[in-house]
Amino acid sequence: MKLLGWMHRKLRSNNDVFKEFNTGGGGACNCITGLASPDHDNDYFSGDDAAHASPPVTAGDLFTFGGSGLLTIGTLGIAAVAIPSGGDDDDYDIDFEVDATSDDDGGFTVEDDDADVGGAVTPTFTFPAATAAEAVVATVEKAVAAVEAIAEKDDDTTTEDDLMVVSAELEKVLGGVDVASARVSFAMGGGVDCPLQGFLFGSPVSDVESRPEYLQAPRDSSGSCGGGGRRTSLGELFMRTRFADEKVALVAVAEGEDGVAGDDGAAAAGVGGDRAGKGGGYKTMKKRKVKDEKGGGGAAGGGMPATVTKSKFQKILQIFHRKVYPENTLLTRNLTKKSRNRGATDNGGGAVATGDPDGPLASPVLRCRKDHPMRGFGCCTNGAFGASSPGGNAEMNGNKSGHWIKTDADYLVLEL
Protein backbone atom coordinates (compact mmCIF):
# COMPACT_ATOMS: atom_id res chain seq x y z
CA MET A 1 0.00 0.00 0.00
CA LYS A 2 2.83 2.42 0.74
CA LEU A 3 4.44 1.69 -2.61
CA LEU A 4 1.13 2.19 -4.41
CA GLY A 5 0.59 5.52 -2.66
CA TRP A 6 4.06 6.70 -3.60
CA MET A 7 3.45 5.81 -7.25
CA HIS A 8 0.16 7.73 -7.36
CA ARG A 9 1.69 10.69 -5.63
CA LYS A 10 4.43 10.89 -8.23
CA LEU A 11 1.89 10.47 -11.01
CA ARG A 12 -0.30 13.31 -9.77
CA SER A 13 2.59 15.70 -9.19
CA ASN A 14 4.14 15.13 -12.62
CA ASN A 15 1.08 14.86 -14.88
CA ASP A 16 -0.77 18.02 -15.99
CA VAL A 17 -3.92 16.14 -16.94
CA PHE A 18 -4.66 15.15 -13.38
CA LYS A 19 -3.98 18.73 -12.23
CA GLU A 20 -6.59 20.09 -14.63
CA PHE A 21 -9.12 17.54 -13.36
CA ASN A 22 -8.41 18.46 -9.74
CA THR A 23 -8.83 22.22 -10.29
CA GLY A 24 -11.99 21.68 -12.32
CA GLY A 25 -11.03 24.46 -14.74
CA GLY A 26 -10.77 22.68 -18.02
CA GLY A 27 -12.56 19.40 -17.65
CA ALA A 28 -12.01 16.85 -20.35
CA CYS A 29 -11.25 19.49 -23.01
CA ASN A 30 -8.14 20.66 -21.25
CA CYS A 31 -6.50 17.23 -21.54
CA ILE A 32 -4.57 18.27 -24.66
CA THR A 33 -3.35 21.60 -23.30
CA GLY A 34 0.30 21.45 -22.46
CA LEU A 35 0.86 23.62 -19.42
CA ALA A 36 4.26 23.89 -17.84
CA SER A 37 4.24 22.67 -14.30
CA PRO A 38 5.71 24.97 -11.68
CA ASP A 39 8.98 24.10 -10.08
CA HIS A 40 7.57 23.40 -6.66
CA ASP A 41 5.19 20.73 -8.02
CA ASN A 42 7.92 18.84 -9.92
CA ASP A 43 9.64 16.46 -7.51
CA TYR A 44 12.33 15.51 -10.00
CA PHE A 45 13.75 19.02 -10.53
CA SER A 46 12.89 20.88 -7.33
CA GLY A 47 15.64 21.10 -4.79
CA ASP A 48 13.39 22.08 -1.88
CA ASP A 49 11.05 19.15 -2.36
CA ALA A 50 13.95 16.76 -2.67
CA ALA A 51 15.41 17.98 0.60
CA HIS A 52 12.17 17.61 2.56
CA ALA A 53 9.88 14.66 3.03
CA SER A 54 6.69 14.31 1.02
CA PRO A 55 3.39 15.21 2.66
CA PRO A 56 1.37 12.32 4.09
CA VAL A 57 -0.98 10.55 1.71
CA THR A 58 -4.62 10.18 2.70
CA ALA A 59 -7.06 7.50 1.73
CA GLY A 60 -8.96 9.96 -0.46
CA ASP A 61 -5.86 10.63 -2.54
CA LEU A 62 -5.34 6.91 -3.01
CA PHE A 63 -8.83 6.06 -4.25
CA THR A 64 -10.40 9.20 -5.78
CA PHE A 65 -9.31 12.40 -7.48
CA GLY A 66 -11.29 15.27 -5.91
CA GLY A 67 -14.60 13.44 -6.05
CA SER A 68 -14.56 13.19 -9.84
CA GLY A 69 -15.26 9.47 -9.81
CA LEU A 70 -11.94 8.39 -11.41
CA LEU A 71 -10.32 5.23 -10.15
CA THR A 72 -6.65 5.25 -9.25
CA ILE A 73 -5.86 2.41 -11.63
CA GLY A 74 -6.20 4.83 -14.54
CA THR A 75 -9.52 3.75 -16.01
CA LEU A 76 -12.75 5.73 -16.02
CA GLY A 77 -15.21 4.39 -13.50
CA ILE A 78 -18.92 4.91 -13.09
CA ALA A 79 -19.03 5.08 -9.33
CA ALA A 80 -16.42 6.18 -6.86
CA VAL A 81 -14.98 3.82 -4.31
CA ALA A 82 -16.50 4.11 -0.88
CA ILE A 83 -13.93 5.44 1.54
CA PRO A 84 -14.22 4.58 5.21
CA SER A 85 -14.24 7.54 7.54
CA GLY A 86 -12.78 7.83 10.99
CA GLY A 87 -9.44 7.42 12.59
CA ASP A 88 -8.56 4.34 10.53
CA ASP A 89 -8.00 6.37 7.35
CA ASP A 90 -4.35 7.11 8.01
CA ASP A 91 -3.02 3.59 8.50
CA TYR A 92 -3.96 0.37 6.76
CA ASP A 93 -1.04 -1.74 7.94
CA ILE A 94 -2.21 -4.61 10.12
CA ASP A 95 0.25 -6.17 12.51
CA PHE A 96 -0.60 -9.27 14.50
CA GLU A 97 1.26 -9.81 17.70
CA VAL A 98 1.79 -13.52 18.04
CA ASP A 99 2.81 -15.05 21.32
CA ALA A 100 4.40 -18.48 21.26
CA THR A 101 4.23 -20.17 24.63
CA SER A 102 5.34 -23.58 25.67
CA ASP A 103 3.02 -25.71 27.75
CA ASP A 104 4.15 -27.71 30.69
CA ASP A 105 3.06 -30.96 29.03
CA GLY A 106 5.61 -30.64 26.27
CA GLY A 107 3.13 -29.21 23.71
CA PHE A 108 3.53 -26.15 21.56
CA THR A 109 0.64 -23.64 21.39
CA VAL A 110 0.23 -20.64 19.07
CA GLU A 111 -1.98 -17.79 20.35
CA ASP A 112 -2.79 -14.24 19.19
CA ASP A 113 -4.43 -11.27 20.88
CA ASP A 114 -7.44 -10.96 18.56
CA ALA A 115 -8.76 -14.44 19.12
CA ASP A 116 -12.42 -13.48 18.95
CA VAL A 117 -12.33 -11.46 15.71
CA GLY A 118 -14.97 -12.75 13.32
CA GLY A 119 -15.85 -15.62 15.62
CA ALA A 120 -12.80 -17.60 14.48
CA VAL A 121 -11.17 -20.03 16.87
CA THR A 122 -7.46 -19.75 17.49
CA PRO A 123 -5.68 -22.89 16.28
CA THR A 124 -3.73 -24.77 18.91
CA PHE A 125 -1.01 -27.25 18.01
CA THR A 126 -0.22 -29.74 20.74
CA PHE A 127 2.25 -32.58 20.23
CA PRO A 128 1.35 -35.88 21.92
CA ALA A 129 3.62 -37.24 24.58
CA ALA A 130 6.27 -39.75 23.47
CA THR A 131 4.77 -42.69 25.31
CA ALA A 132 5.09 -45.20 22.47
CA ALA A 133 8.78 -44.44 21.93
CA GLU A 134 9.51 -44.78 25.62
CA ALA A 135 7.74 -48.13 25.71
CA VAL A 136 9.79 -49.41 22.77
CA VAL A 137 13.02 -48.24 24.38
CA ALA A 138 12.11 -49.96 27.63
CA THR A 139 11.34 -53.21 25.79
CA VAL A 140 14.65 -53.11 23.95
CA GLU A 141 16.54 -52.46 27.16
CA LYS A 142 14.87 -55.42 28.83
CA ALA A 143 15.73 -57.68 25.91
CA VAL A 144 19.36 -56.55 25.90
CA ALA A 145 19.62 -57.15 29.64
CA ALA A 146 18.15 -60.65 29.25
CA VAL A 147 20.57 -61.53 26.44
CA GLU A 148 23.54 -60.26 28.44
CA ALA A 149 22.47 -62.32 31.43
CA ILE A 150 22.24 -65.42 29.25
CA ALA A 151 25.66 -64.72 27.72
CA GLU A 152 27.26 -64.54 31.15
CA LYS A 153 26.03 -68.02 32.03
CA ASP A 154 28.21 -71.09 31.62
CA ASP A 155 27.66 -73.66 28.91
CA ASP A 156 26.41 -76.22 31.42
CA THR A 157 23.74 -73.96 32.93
CA THR A 158 22.26 -72.84 29.59
CA THR A 159 18.70 -74.08 29.18
CA GLU A 160 16.40 -74.41 26.21
CA ASP A 161 14.41 -71.37 27.32
CA ASP A 162 17.54 -69.25 27.18
CA LEU A 163 18.31 -70.53 23.72
CA MET A 164 14.79 -69.75 22.57
CA VAL A 165 15.07 -66.19 23.91
CA VAL A 166 18.36 -65.62 22.10
CA SER A 167 16.94 -67.17 18.93
CA ALA A 168 13.94 -64.84 19.07
CA GLU A 169 16.22 -61.82 19.47
CA LEU A 170 18.29 -62.96 16.51
CA GLU A 171 15.14 -63.32 14.44
CA LYS A 172 14.18 -59.74 15.27
CA VAL A 173 17.61 -58.42 14.38
CA LEU A 174 17.81 -60.35 11.13
CA GLY A 175 14.36 -59.23 10.06
CA GLY A 176 12.59 -62.48 10.81
CA VAL A 177 9.63 -60.83 12.54
CA ASP A 178 7.59 -60.83 9.33
CA VAL A 179 8.31 -64.50 8.68
CA ALA A 180 5.68 -66.99 9.78
CA SER A 181 6.22 -68.84 13.03
CA ALA A 182 6.51 -72.16 11.21
CA ARG A 183 10.28 -71.98 11.43
CA VAL A 184 11.39 -74.27 14.23
CA SER A 185 14.41 -73.44 16.33
CA PHE A 186 17.34 -75.80 16.31
CA ALA A 187 16.88 -76.39 20.05
CA MET A 188 13.37 -77.74 19.47
CA GLY A 189 14.06 -79.71 16.29
CA GLY A 190 17.55 -80.86 17.12
CA GLY A 191 18.39 -81.73 13.52
CA VAL A 192 19.08 -78.43 11.80
CA ASP A 193 22.68 -78.31 10.60
CA CYS A 194 23.87 -74.72 10.98
CA PRO A 195 27.40 -74.10 12.25
CA LEU A 196 26.71 -70.45 13.02
CA GLN A 197 24.23 -71.41 15.73
CA GLY A 198 26.82 -73.50 17.52
CA PHE A 199 29.30 -70.65 17.39
CA LEU A 200 26.85 -68.06 18.72
CA PHE A 201 25.37 -70.12 21.52
CA GLY A 202 28.49 -72.10 22.45
CA SER A 203 26.54 -74.94 24.04
CA PRO A 204 26.57 -78.74 23.62
CA VAL A 205 23.20 -78.54 21.86
CA SER A 206 24.90 -77.38 18.67
CA ASP A 207 26.96 -80.58 18.50
CA VAL A 208 24.15 -83.05 19.17
CA GLU A 209 23.07 -85.06 16.12
CA SER A 210 24.22 -82.33 13.75
CA ARG A 211 27.27 -84.21 12.48
CA PRO A 212 28.21 -87.84 11.85
CA GLU A 213 29.77 -89.81 14.65
CA TYR A 214 33.24 -89.95 13.11
CA LEU A 215 33.32 -86.14 12.96
CA GLN A 216 32.18 -85.52 16.53
CA ALA A 217 34.88 -84.61 19.03
CA PRO A 218 35.09 -86.60 22.29
CA ARG A 219 33.34 -85.09 25.28
CA ASP A 220 34.89 -84.61 28.66
CA SER A 221 33.30 -85.23 32.06
CA SER A 222 31.67 -81.79 32.16
CA GLY A 223 29.75 -82.50 28.96
CA SER A 224 31.30 -79.82 26.77
CA CYS A 225 32.59 -80.55 23.31
CA GLY A 226 36.07 -80.28 21.93
CA GLY A 227 37.87 -81.84 24.89
CA GLY A 228 38.99 -79.90 27.93
CA GLY A 229 36.00 -77.53 27.80
CA ARG A 230 37.37 -75.60 24.80
CA ARG A 231 34.76 -73.75 22.80
CA THR A 232 34.56 -74.85 19.19
CA SER A 233 35.66 -72.12 16.82
CA LEU A 234 33.64 -70.94 13.86
CA GLY A 235 36.22 -72.20 11.36
CA GLU A 236 36.13 -75.72 12.81
CA LEU A 237 32.36 -75.81 12.69
CA PHE A 238 32.30 -74.73 9.06
CA MET A 239 34.99 -77.25 8.15
CA ARG A 240 33.06 -80.07 9.84
CA THR A 241 29.90 -79.10 8.01
CA ARG A 242 31.76 -78.94 4.71
CA PHE A 243 33.27 -82.38 5.28
CA ALA A 244 29.84 -83.82 6.03
CA ASP A 245 28.24 -82.23 2.97
CA GLU A 246 30.99 -83.06 0.49
CA LYS A 247 31.97 -86.50 1.70
CA VAL A 248 30.41 -88.15 -1.33
CA ALA A 249 32.18 -85.77 -3.70
CA LEU A 250 35.55 -86.40 -2.05
CA VAL A 251 35.13 -90.17 -2.27
CA ALA A 252 34.11 -89.94 -5.93
CA VAL A 253 37.10 -87.78 -6.80
CA ALA A 254 39.49 -90.09 -4.95
CA GLU A 255 38.09 -93.20 -6.64
CA GLY A 256 38.24 -91.58 -10.07
CA GLU A 257 41.88 -90.56 -9.63
CA ASP A 258 42.77 -94.01 -8.30
CA GLY A 259 41.14 -95.71 -11.29
CA VAL A 260 42.88 -93.51 -13.84
CA ALA A 261 46.22 -93.89 -12.11
CA GLY A 262 45.83 -97.66 -11.94
CA ASP A 263 45.00 -97.96 -15.65
CA ASP A 264 47.86 -95.71 -16.70
CA GLY A 265 50.29 -97.55 -14.44
CA ALA A 266 49.28 -100.95 -15.79
CA ALA A 267 49.56 -99.82 -19.41
CA ALA A 268 52.92 -98.17 -18.84
CA ALA A 269 54.23 -101.22 -16.97
CA GLY A 270 53.25 -103.56 -19.80
CA VAL A 271 54.76 -101.36 -22.51
CA GLY A 272 57.55 -99.19 -21.09
CA GLY A 273 59.25 -101.11 -18.31
CA ASP A 274 59.85 -101.07 -14.58
CA ARG A 275 60.03 -97.28 -14.11
CA ALA A 276 56.55 -96.55 -15.43
CA GLY A 277 55.07 -99.45 -13.49
CA LYS A 278 56.76 -98.32 -10.30
CA GLY A 279 55.46 -94.80 -10.74
CA GLY A 280 51.87 -95.89 -11.32
CA GLY A 281 51.90 -98.35 -8.45
CA TYR A 282 53.40 -95.78 -6.07
CA LYS A 283 50.74 -93.26 -7.01
CA THR A 284 47.93 -95.75 -6.49
CA MET A 285 49.39 -96.90 -3.18
CA LYS A 286 49.73 -93.33 -1.95
CA LYS A 287 46.14 -92.48 -2.84
CA ARG A 288 44.78 -95.55 -1.13
CA LYS A 289 46.90 -94.92 1.94
CA VAL A 290 45.59 -91.39 2.26
CA LYS A 291 42.04 -92.63 1.83
CA ASP A 292 42.44 -95.32 4.49
CA GLU A 293 44.00 -92.92 6.97
CA LYS A 294 41.21 -90.44 6.35
CA GLY A 295 38.54 -93.06 7.00
CA GLY A 296 40.14 -94.55 10.12
CA GLY A 297 41.65 -91.48 11.73
CA GLY A 298 38.36 -89.65 12.29
CA ALA A 299 36.70 -92.62 13.95
CA ALA A 300 39.65 -93.27 16.22
CA GLY A 301 39.85 -89.62 17.20
CA GLY A 302 43.65 -89.51 16.83
CA GLY A 303 45.74 -86.86 15.14
CA MET A 304 46.27 -87.02 11.39
CA PRO A 305 49.71 -86.69 9.80
CA ALA A 306 50.66 -83.56 7.92
CA THR A 307 50.55 -85.26 4.51
CA VAL A 308 46.95 -86.38 4.99
CA THR A 309 45.88 -82.91 6.12
CA LYS A 310 47.59 -81.34 3.13
CA SER A 311 45.95 -83.81 0.77
CA LYS A 312 42.53 -83.02 2.24
CA PHE A 313 43.13 -79.32 1.92
CA GLN A 314 44.16 -79.72 -1.71
CA LYS A 315 41.05 -81.75 -2.51
CA ILE A 316 38.81 -79.20 -0.81
CA LEU A 317 40.52 -76.45 -2.77
CA GLN A 318 40.00 -78.36 -6.02
CA ILE A 319 36.30 -78.86 -5.28
CA PHE A 320 35.97 -75.17 -4.46
CA HIS A 321 37.57 -74.19 -7.75
CA ARG A 322 35.35 -76.61 -9.64
CA LYS A 323 32.27 -74.99 -8.14
CA VAL A 324 33.44 -71.43 -8.74
CA TYR A 325 34.98 -71.95 -12.20
CA PRO A 326 33.17 -74.92 -13.80
CA GLU A 327 34.13 -73.93 -17.36
CA ASN A 328 37.85 -73.88 -16.54
CA THR A 329 37.62 -77.28 -14.90
CA LEU A 330 35.86 -78.78 -17.92
CA LEU A 331 38.44 -77.30 -20.28
CA THR A 332 41.29 -78.70 -18.20
CA ARG A 333 39.77 -82.17 -18.20
CA ASN A 334 39.31 -82.12 -21.97
CA LEU A 335 42.89 -80.99 -22.57
CA THR A 336 44.19 -83.67 -20.22
CA LYS A 337 42.26 -86.40 -22.03
CA LYS A 338 43.45 -85.18 -25.45
CA SER A 339 47.08 -85.06 -24.40
CA ARG A 340 46.75 -88.52 -22.87
CA ASN A 341 45.27 -89.97 -26.05
CA ARG A 342 47.85 -88.22 -28.23
CA GLY A 343 50.71 -89.59 -26.13
CA ALA A 344 49.33 -93.11 -26.39
CA THR A 345 48.97 -92.76 -30.19
CA ASP A 346 52.46 -91.36 -30.75
CA ASN A 347 54.20 -93.78 -28.41
CA GLY A 348 52.20 -96.85 -29.44
CA GLY A 349 54.93 -98.22 -31.74
CA GLY A 350 58.54 -97.31 -32.32
CA ALA A 351 62.00 -97.75 -30.99
CA VAL A 352 61.68 -94.99 -28.41
CA ALA A 353 58.49 -96.32 -26.85
CA THR A 354 59.03 -100.09 -27.02
CA GLY A 355 62.80 -100.33 -27.15
CA ASP A 356 62.60 -102.56 -30.23
CA PRO A 357 65.41 -101.73 -32.72
CA ASP A 358 63.57 -103.48 -35.58
CA GLY A 359 60.47 -101.34 -35.21
CA PRO A 360 59.86 -98.12 -37.10
CA LEU A 361 61.58 -94.99 -35.94
CA ALA A 362 59.87 -92.43 -33.78
CA SER A 363 58.21 -89.36 -35.22
CA PRO A 364 60.43 -86.71 -36.88
CA VAL A 365 59.38 -84.20 -34.27
CA LEU A 366 60.84 -86.30 -31.46
CA ARG A 367 64.04 -86.98 -33.41
CA CYS A 368 64.33 -83.27 -34.20
CA ARG A 369 63.96 -82.30 -30.58
CA LYS A 370 66.44 -84.96 -29.52
CA ASP A 371 69.06 -83.82 -32.01
CA HIS A 372 68.63 -80.12 -31.24
CA PRO A 373 68.76 -79.39 -27.50
CA MET A 374 67.54 -75.80 -27.96
CA ARG A 375 63.89 -75.95 -28.85
CA GLY A 376 62.59 -73.57 -31.46
CA PHE A 377 65.90 -73.24 -33.37
CA GLY A 378 66.00 -76.39 -35.45
CA CYS A 379 64.15 -78.06 -38.23
CA CYS A 380 60.88 -77.68 -36.29
CA THR A 381 60.93 -73.96 -36.90
CA ASN A 382 61.05 -74.33 -40.67
CA GLY A 383 57.81 -73.33 -42.33
CA ALA A 384 58.20 -75.94 -45.08
CA PHE A 385 58.62 -78.76 -42.60
CA GLY A 386 54.90 -79.51 -42.57
CA ALA A 387 54.85 -80.16 -46.28
CA SER A 388 57.77 -82.60 -46.16
CA SER A 389 56.60 -84.39 -43.03
CA PRO A 390 54.68 -87.67 -43.21
CA GLY A 391 50.92 -87.77 -43.21
CA GLY A 392 50.78 -88.97 -39.62
CA ASN A 393 52.30 -85.74 -38.34
CA ALA A 394 50.57 -83.35 -40.75
CA GLU A 395 47.86 -82.47 -38.27
CA MET A 396 50.36 -81.77 -35.49
CA ASN A 397 52.58 -79.59 -37.67
CA GLY A 398 49.76 -77.82 -39.48
CA ASN A 399 47.16 -76.90 -36.84
CA LYS A 400 48.27 -77.77 -33.34
CA SER A 401 51.93 -76.67 -33.49
CA GLY A 402 52.91 -73.28 -34.87
CA HIS A 403 55.99 -72.03 -36.70
CA TRP A 404 58.09 -68.91 -36.63
CA ILE A 405 57.01 -65.89 -38.69
CA LYS A 406 59.88 -65.08 -41.03
CA THR A 407 58.29 -63.11 -43.86
CA ASP A 408 55.61 -60.48 -44.29
CA ALA A 409 53.47 -62.97 -46.17
CA ASP A 410 53.27 -65.24 -43.13
CA TYR A 411 52.28 -62.31 -40.92
CA LEU A 412 49.63 -61.23 -43.44
CA VAL A 413 48.13 -64.72 -43.50
CA LEU A 414 47.99 -64.82 -39.70
CA GLU A 415 46.41 -61.37 -39.55
CA LEU A 416 43.68 -62.33 -42.04
Curated annotation (Swiss-Prot):
Residues spanning the membrane: 63-83
Entry's localization field: Cell membrane; Nucleus
Tissue: Expressed specifically in the cells at the inner side of the vascular bundles of young leaf sheaths and peripheral cylinders of vascular bundles in the unelongated stems. Expressed in the leaf sheath pulvinus and the lamina joint.
Phenotype upon loss of function: Tiller-spreading phenotype due to defective shoot and tiller gravitropism. Extremely larger leaf angle at reproductive stage. Altered endogenous auxin distribution in shoots.
InterPro entries on file: LAZY1 (IPR038928)
Primary localization: membrane
Name this protein carries in UniProt: Protein LAZY 1
Encoding gene per record: LA1
